[in-house]
Amino acid sequence: MRRNIIAVKTRPGEVRFVAVASIERVEAFGNYVKIYFGNERVLHRATLSDMEYILDDRFIRIHRSHIVKRDHLRKLLSELGRYQEVELADETVLPLGGNYKRQLMLELGL
């Protein structure tokens, strides 16, 4: 189910509401995910698959541990002619998983 807001328990007795539009990326972190937005990040008890279901088509999974907002992608980085990493708008470099590379390339028209 696509949502506009995600309710995140940040600590006992506190729930934070995060606008999906503000999310830049999501990273798997054990039984949790780290949600990155602006200069902040919060832990949320969910799987990356749960987040794929919640997030809309502005997001794409690039690795078994990473989902990123499409408009946050800046560069594909290659080594020996094979794209293996992506650089985000904030200059973070993330791995590009083989299982997700083809879909990303198709969506980018490459």
Residue spans for each PLM region:
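DNA major-groove recognition helices of helix-turn-helix
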Residues: 51, 103-104
